[in-house]
A protein has these predicted regions:
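Conserved catalytic core of the tyrosine transesterase superfamily
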Residues: 1-324
C-alpha cells in the first residue's frame, strides 16, 4: 500500500489487510477502498478514535449518481473492518447487512457473430511497436483466449509461461475469483494458436514469467485489457449498433458461456446434466452463478428457448428487471 494511512483507524486497517493476506486473499480492491476510507476519516473525523454509527453511515450513504452495486462494494470492506475491530475487543459499529439494497445484476452484452468477426479482424491488423516488441503478438491471442475459453480478463492477464502445457493443452488458472485454482483444457485450434504464439514471443523474451508480457517482459497492469478493447472496438462500424449496456472485455466470457449452452441444446444435450461441467470450467463457486446464463441464452437464441422450454422449465430463472 503506497498511500500512508493517517487516520486513527490506521492500526486496525493494517491489521485487517494483513489478516486477509495471510490466509491467501489478495485483498487489493478492498485495500484501495480502505485507503479511501482512511482519507475520509482523516478529513471529516480527524480526532475520532471510535468507529461510530455516525461515521459508518456517513460513509455508507449513497452518493450522487452512484450505482447501488458500487455502493455495495464500497461498504463491504468497512463492514469487515468493524467486524475485525470487534473480534480483537475494540468496539465498532457494523453497518447492517441490508444496507445497501440488493445489488442489481449486470446485464452483459452478448457479442454477435458480425461483431466478433469485426473485432478480431481489427486486432489482427496490429503492427509491431518499437516500444513494446511483443504487443502485436499478445493482443490477438489474449482476446481469443478470453473468448474461446471463457476466461476472466485477469485470469488471462496473469497467466505464467508454465501455466499452459503445450503438449497436452492443459491450462492452469491460479488464484482466481474466490481464490480457487482450476484447470481448463484448450481446444486443439486454440492450443495450436498458443504454440505458435509461444514460439514467437519466447524469441523476444526467452526468460519471461508472464505468458502475455509487457514491454519489460512483465505482467500487464489490470487496466490494459480495457484500454486495448476500446482502442480497437470503439471505431468499428458495429460498435454503435447495440442495445442495453455497452460491451466490455468481460462480456467475451459471457458470450462464450451463452454460446456453449446454445450449442449443447442444438446437439440435444441435457442441460441439467451439463450445467455443472460449465460451472466448473468457468470457475464458479455456486451453480446459481451459472444458471444466470440460461436466461440470456433463452433470450438471445430462439432455438435454445424453443428446445429447452420443456427440458429445463424449472431451471430457467425469471428475469429480474430491477431498475437502477
Amino acid at each position: 500500500m503506497s498511500y500512508k494511512l493517517s487516520s486513527n483507524f490506521k492500526p486496525y486497517i493494517e491489521g485487517l489487510i494483513e489478516q486477509k493476506q495471510v490466509v491467501g486473499y489478495p485483498y487489493d480492491t478492498s485495500s484501495m477502498i480502505l485507503k479511501d476510507f482512511d482519507r475520509f476519516c482523516s478529513k471529516h473525523h480527524p480526532t475520532a478514535t471510535v468507529l461510530t454509527a455516525e461515521i459508518s453511515m456517513q460513509w455508507a450513504a449513497r452518493r450522487t449518481d452512484e450505482h447501488v452495486n458500487y455502493q455495495f462494494r464500497r461498504i463491504t470492506p468497512i463492514r469487515q473492518l468493524a467486524k475485525y475491530m470487534n473480534s480483537i475487543g475494540v468496539d465498532a459499529y457494523v453497518i447492517p447487512p441490508k444496507i445497501p439494497q440488493k445489488q442489481i445484476r449486470y446485464v452483459p452484452h452478448i457479442f454477435t457473430k458480425p461483431e466478433l468477426h469485426a473485432f478480431f479482424n481489427e486486432i489482427d491488423k496490429r503492427l509491431p511497436s518499437p516500444f513494446s516488441p511483443a504487443r502485436h503478438l499478445v493482443v490477438p491471442v489474449f482476446f481469443r483466449l478470453v473468448y474461446c475459453c471463457g476466461l476472466r480478463p485477469s485470469e488471462a492477464r496473469l497467466l505464467h509461461t508454465g501455466d499452459i502445457d503445450m503438449a497436452t493443452g492443459r491450462m492452469f488458472i491460479r488464484q482466481s475469483k474466490g481464490h480457487k485454482d482450476r484447470t481448463v483444457m484448450l481446444a486443439e485450434d486454440v492450443l495450436a494458436l498458443c504454440r505458435k504464439y509461444e514460439t514467437k514471443v519466447s524469441r523476444i523474451f526467452p526468460d519471461r514469467q508472464a505468458f502475455f508480457p509487457n514491454s519489460k517482459g512483465e505482467f500487464y497492469n489490470r487496466s490494459i485489457p480495457d484500454y486495448w478493447f476500446h482502442l480497437f472496438w470503439d471505431h468499428l462500424e458495429v460498435a454503435g449498433i447495440y442495445s442495453g449496456n455497452s460491451p466490455r472485455v468481460h462480456d467475451f466470457r459471457h458470450a462464450f458461456s451463452v454460446r456453449r449452452l446454445n450449442l449443447w441444446v442444438n446437439e440435444g444435450r441435457d442441460i441439467n446434466a451439463y450445467l455443472p461441467y460449465l460451472s466448473m470450467y468457468l470457475g464458479h463457486v455456486h451453480l446459481t452463478d451459472t444458471d444466470y446464463y440460461i436466461h440470456f441464452a433463452s433470450e438471445f437464441f430462439p432455438t435454445f428457448k424453443r428446445k429447452s422450454t420443456l427440458a429445463c422449465a424449472d431451471l430457467i430463472p425469471e428475469a429480474n428487471h430491477a431498475k437502477k
